[in-house]
């Protein structure tokens, strides 16, 4: 299975998603063809390359190589990764990613903005399937009052709002190309929280898994006692869709007081959103109690 990961780095779960996929690459279960960094200022490019070097993984990194933007990489990462140095690096240009992917079958996992999707589709590079961390299925879709979001139909979601123009363009293009697209929604993600006690005592079998355990434990001890691993859940959906309950929808939006808010309406679209899932089993895969 060929996989491309597009990630941002503001939340630690993107880092963990990269390490999660890298583990299965090092186990020979998948071929991680490329990592695309959203947006790709020098310090962010450096961070992603640092991670890959640390786990001895030779995978090409691509980005838009924008000017330095400190908002893409939190300061606390330099505490979390004690040997991470503030350096400037460029990635390969996204045009080179097109050359790499043309003619290949691959699945795309998106943990950052949706900016890469229209870039690929408009350049006639079509993933087999797309898995996006983002979106919201309200009570009109789930039929249930949510334990955190109540009876809401709309909610702001970070990834969709990171580049609203790209999000809207993505769904416009998907009407035309109808690539199977799976949205791993915040209404499910926020009900699957990982604590340190969930992490099994097991010997890591790859460099990526070793760093995954190390960083997850350190994060939970130092910064937050429990964490939803949104992007890791998107990776799990790519491996095993039947762990999740899906409904076919069209994403819709409205202007909120502060941010654009997103919801869903049922429709034939080939876009599917999570409305439920086997939470304990998803959690087991997220902490490697179970493996694919």
Swiss-Prot record:
InterPro entries tied to this protein: Inosine/uridine_hydrolase_dom, Ribo_hydro-like
GO MF annotations in UniProt: hydrolase activity, hydrolyzing N-glycosyl compounds
Matching Pfam families: IU_nuc_hydro
Protein name: Uncharacterized protein aq_983
Lineage of the organism: Bacteria, Pseudomonadati, Aquificota, Aquificia, Aquificales
